[in-house]
Amino acid sequence: MSLADRTTFKRRLDDLGVTVTEGPRSACAELVDEAAGEPAVGVARAAAELPDRVETEPTTADLREAHTGVTAAELGVAAYGSVAIEADRAGTEPVSLFVDRHVVVLREADLVPDMPDAFEWLGPRARDESSDVVFATGPSATADMGGLVHGAHGPKEVHVVLLRDEEADGDAAGESGADGDAAGE
């Protein structure tokens, strides 16, 4: 991941109306807590990084009532502002789709510049048939019903929590921006 990829990703997310919050991995639970509305559901595999108020073993009723779904993304595609959401037994895909707000947790190190790089990452998973992945780009929008409608086939809002590795914070200490976030690795 380069500074250019990070900058491009953030610019594309902004173009799509997606909010981005950045911070170190150690602050993940706090950042998610600030981004998530009530009630919130999430997937168990990210439980160590989620605030206690996020239900990590949601029932169907919990999912129906949830305002926010919190998932991890396996990959981010900078050129499109897309995130790779895995369809797994933990329920990542439904938690990302059946809510008004989807909070996506993505490690900065998991950003790639473009789709050829994303397909290179996806190739072994597809060949092994070990993974189903959806590339999601921004909030749900459709014009199937006449005018543009948001939230008909997925979340109305998307919020990305972009996490830096702790080592990157130390390496970039002299390259901080005005808001105190590291400018690159």
Description of each model-found segment:
Residues M1-E185:
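The feature marks the mature, well-folded catalytic cores of soluble enzymes
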